[in-house]
Amino acid sequence: MSKVKVHAGICGFVSNIKVNKTEGKNAKVKIVSACGMIKDLSNEMTEINWINSMTREMANSEVYKITDKYITHAACPVPSAILKAVEVEFGLALPKDVTMKIEKD
């Protein structure tokens, strides 16, 4: 199982993502969050195919197609975090934290 904890930023929501490889190219996805949009997303995104998520243009990724139905904030980091968990779970990347430092001068 691969896990990602997302502190989304100014919204204050934390999302916990778990991806668990099942058969072939499929994985179970479990997302827990207090964000209503992420909760709605998690109700549909319970299983994904890594090929349909990782090897398509961003707009055609299974993750982003489902995300587009529920999340109205384009800069939400959760969809990217789901893909990062998928990468790690299927051995496409090593587990490594991603950091964004945002400043305004």
Task: Map each language-model feature to its residues.
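Short, charged/polar N-terminal "headpieces" of proteins
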Residues: 1-27
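Short, compact, well-ordered microdomains
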Residues: 2, 72-103
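Glycine-rich beta-alpha junction loops
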Residues: 10, 33-35, 86
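A generic structural micro-environment signature
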Residues: 12, 25, 47, 51, ...
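Generic preference for hydrophobic/aromatic residues in regular secondary structure cores
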Residues: 17-19, 63, 99-102
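Active-site- and interface-proximal helix/loop "cap" or "latch" segments in soluble metabolic
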Residues: 22-80, 93-94
